[in-house]
């Protein structure tokens, strides 16, 4: 049956009714309008759900584009200022108008040829990435063994603990956390394990359980829109793109300024868990997952964490794992410059605090949700944690990431 026939069938079979005043739904638009007003307001000023840290996602969008080597116009900055003022006044008519204009400015941002971003190779595909790195031979792992099952249990438990801990403190500097709480060595309140650190991994697992190692980025994307109602920053825009029929890799690049933020990097663990002892396979799966919402260095962040997770099943020395993972990032990429700098700081500084301060200063132009400062904090925590989970957790918590 053709679409016109379906529509005609509905029309021909419609039976006239008289609706009561209460049944008419035009006034329901008032509630719908309030929903969209509140949702838009979050882009201009909100608080992180778990920690309460303030954030302004529209400001961060400009920051993220400039980090990626683009120049936002003076008009864009003027609109940014006006939007912040309109949001503060709750002038939603003006805020909707400014937001539309602002998004056009972001979409039309011009390449900044003077940006150091373009001094590095930008990696657009797994094939391009694969040609530039050397992977070790895969080490067979008996996935039916009790040892492997215990490793998987520990992996999930550690992620849940880390996620619960992180959501309490994310978005605050080390200095302010220290001032407010001293040394944080345990939960500051009753932990909550529901967060986006885990939900996207479960969506990947859902697609993987059906397709196995043949899983595609499209499979993962469909799992997202079927299971995850909403996201934030890169993931929110990717979900919106997918629902509009824009699939990977375009879902991660189309009007998505946040595609080098932490989102892909944070969900990499599952890719390593389903590829134990095989970092090349873990990297390939991470690329498929990453390009749903991210691109370039954002995907390399997921690759980095995925290969570390994969190697952790067959290597117990944490510094060896981190160092080997760094070697699996192309040396001409900007992401490599970040992780190698963080590693160098660790090698040269006596304390994690000293290493952190150096990284904070070097990457102060990046939002705390960007992949780069997060990667630095990971390396610092793993290096100085020396394989002790409690010590590592303490350091990463104090980093406020």
Please annotate each region the language model reported.
Residues 191-199, 257-263, 294-302, 367-371, ...:
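Active-site nucleophile and cofactor-binding loops and adjacent substrate-binding regions
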Residues 130-144, 148, 239-243, 249-259, ...:
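Accessory "access/gating" subregions that flank catalytic or transport cores
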Residues 191-231, 261:
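Aromatic-rich carbohydrate-recognition surfaces in CAZymes
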Residues 134-201:
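An N-terminal structural lobe/cap that precedes and organizes the functional/catalytic core
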Residues 153-169, 260-267, 298, 401:
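Conserved phosphate/anionic-ligand binding catalytic regions in large, soluble enzymes, centered on
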Residues 217, 222-262:
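Extracytoplasmic mature domains of secreted/periplasmic and thylakoid-lumen proteins
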Residues 1-118:
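Long, charge-dense tracts
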Residues 113-132, 138-139:
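N-terminal regions that are enriched for targeting/export leaders
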């Amino acid at each position: 049956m053709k679409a016109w026939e379906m529509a005609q069938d509905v029309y021909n079979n419609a039976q006239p009714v008289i609706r009561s005043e209460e049944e008419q739904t035009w006034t329901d638009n008032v509630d719908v309008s309030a929903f969209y007003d509140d949702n838009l307001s979050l882009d201009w000023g909100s608080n992180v759900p778990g920690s309460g840290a303030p954030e302004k996602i529209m400001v961060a969008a400009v920051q993220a584009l400039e980090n990626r080597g683009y120049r936002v116009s003076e008009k864009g900055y003027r609109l940014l200022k006006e939007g912040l003022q309109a949001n503060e006044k709750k002038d939603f008519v003006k805020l909707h108008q400014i937001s539309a204009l602002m998004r056009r400015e972001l979409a039309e941002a011009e390449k900044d040829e003077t940006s150091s971003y373009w001094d590095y190779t930008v990696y657009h595909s797994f094939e391009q990435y694969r040609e530039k790195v050397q992977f070790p031979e895969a080490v067979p792992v008996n996935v039916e063994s009790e040892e492997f099952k215990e490793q998987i249990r520990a992996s999930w438990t550690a992620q849940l603990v880390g996620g619960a801990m992180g959501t309490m403190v994310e978005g605050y500097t080390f200095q302010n956390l220290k001032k407010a709480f001293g040394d944080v060595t345990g939960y500051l309140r009753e932990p909550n394990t529901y967060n986006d650190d885990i939900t996207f991994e479960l969506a990947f697992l859902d697609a993987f359980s059906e397709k196995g190692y043949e899983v595609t980025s499209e499979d993962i994307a469909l799992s997202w829109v079927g299971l995850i109602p909403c996201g934030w920053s890169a993931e929110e825009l990717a979900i919106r793109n997918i629902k509009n029929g824009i699939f990977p890799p375009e879902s991660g690049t189309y009007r998505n300024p946040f595609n080098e933020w932490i989102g892909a990097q944070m969900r990499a663990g599952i890719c390593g868990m389903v590829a134990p002892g095989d970092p090349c396979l873990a990297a390939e799966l991470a690329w498929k997952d990453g390009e749903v919402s991210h691109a370039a260095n954002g995907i390399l962040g997921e690759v980095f964490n995925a290969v570390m997770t994969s190697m952790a099943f067959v290597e117990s020395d944490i510094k060896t794992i981190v160092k080997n993972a760094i070697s699996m990032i192309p040396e001409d990429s900007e992401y490599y410059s970040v992780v190698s700098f963080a590693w160098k700081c660790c090698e040269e500084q006596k304390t994690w605090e000293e290493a952190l301060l150096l990284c904070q200063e070097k990457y102060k132009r990046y939002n705390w949700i960007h992949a780069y400062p997060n990667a630095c904090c990971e390396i610092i925590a793993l290096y100085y944690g020396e394989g002790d989970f409690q010590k590592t957790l303490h350091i990463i918590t104090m980093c406020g990431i």
